[in-house]
Amino acid sequence: MKKSLLLLLLIAATIPVSAQSFWQDLYYEPGFDLGHYTPFSANHKYIADYLHYGLDVRIGQEHQGILIGYTHNTLDSVIYYTHEGNRYGPIGDCFSLAYFVDGHIYKGKRWSFDYDIIFGADLWTRHGNEMLGSALNFHVSFDLGPTIRLSEQLDAAIRYGYYHSSNGATFLPNNGINSHFLRMALRYHPNGRTEPLQPENQAFKKKNNLMISEGLGWLQTYTRVGDQLPNETPFFLGNTFRVGFSRQFHRRFRWDVAVDLLWTGETRYCHELEGVPYNFWNSTHLAASADFEAQFGRFAFCAGAAYYLYHGSKLLPEFYTPYYERVGYKFYLGKNRNYYIGTFMKIHLNSIDYIEWTFGVNLF
């Protein structure tokens, strides 16, 4: 456990910094978290009886920073069973290293109502159970709440938020950890407060673009053999190609609507289980989608949803719903920020399909 914490601290220390002003502008925000688990299916209702609590430190500048945290789970002492009777051991504790962006929903003279968007990595001391299929997992959380100015150097912050940790179905079984939490923190500005960044002098101009993106990923199957997951769960390729219309309507916000052409190799596995002939086109899907993004410089946090218009086969993975969600982030490249790379989670009603690794471009 100590070695794992040391590893995360060393990673944080390697974040490249050069300018002296970087250190002068930093604030330090130690906090305490208290939360409860959120069941994701009927046979997991018992986890709502267990709490988790932890400590974290956020080190940041204007609207961004890093988070280093430790979480202890009271569920760690429980031996539990699934509805199939499989015996699983405790989850263990969690070490987190993450990047965050924040902003004001309302800003007054003495207080503000703020949001935080956090993503990074979690290292769990135990894994290979129904909840977590691997030790290293993705960390995603969101929170909202007031920040109260106590003095020129000190703030008090209260946040209520949602937290998720999983590996994106890369290794199964992997239902993931979901929870709601309350966070209380003090923010210290050792060198005083950073002056807010001034908006660009030139007037903002709204932009319309033709948007094209390609996202690849891989997954293990959720499709069961009878009532059980298969003993050997091979990996399958997933792909999402999007083409559509994108509009930058604010300095910080953009939306798009698109047609998604999808392909999943898992369909072949469904055909093999039923003894039905398979061809390449059985794995295709067509959907109409819409995404929204909030931008912080070159970084953008994205969320969206899509509705299926067509399936190449009636034999679909068992967790498929008529719609799916997508959440992730982009990093814009190029002088005019017309290109981007990103990572997205494709989700069917709380079940993560897979992680997409995306490259895209906004044309014209």
Predicted segments — roles?
Residues 38-45, 76-83, 126-131, 168-175, ...:
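Outer-membrane beta-barrel translocator domains and adjoining extracellular loop/strand segments
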Residues 30-38, 61, 70-74, 119-127, ...:
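Transmembrane beta-strands of outer-membrane beta-barrel pores
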Residues 1-29, 111, 148, 190, ...:
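Bacterial Sec-dependent N-terminal signal peptides
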